[in-house]
Amino acid sequence: MGAASRRDCDLAGNSTKIRGSKSLRKGRVSIKGQPYLITSTIHEREDLLNDAQSSGIVAGALHWLHENNRIDLIAYVIMPDHIHFIATLKSGTLPEIMHSLKSYTSKKINKTLKREGGVWQEQYHDHAIRKEEDLKEVIHYCLNNPVRKKLVKSYQDYPYWYCKWEV
């Protein structure tokens, strides 16, 4: 690995760069028709998505991507500081989809909340879902996130979720 730039070092000059993150992004594969679980986190884990307006912006953008044949949206949950969504790619690559989603929602959320600055962390996590049985488990994992965080007793009580199938 090459020398870290000054901005990638702490005060003592030690590298703070996450090793391998660039190579992981480089090796990212986008397969049309492949279901993915995608997780994206708000910058500095700030609770920007804890209201109907901000969550509605993200939900609206996900549904727009679905309605415009960019993704087949299967499920999502919008947590106060991150989102999980499950979708299959229809057109474009995963990085293109994520760029569209983050760029649009950042501008709208900043305008709505009358704020400036970053909304999303640059990175996101994607996991290709291999089998149909796994897909059901991943949907349950995704939708039950608010339950695990003790925000609600049942995911149906949480206001910011969607699933195209009955679970």
Annotate each predicted stretch with a short phrase.
Residues 1-167:
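Short catalytic/metal-binding and nucleic-acid-binding patches
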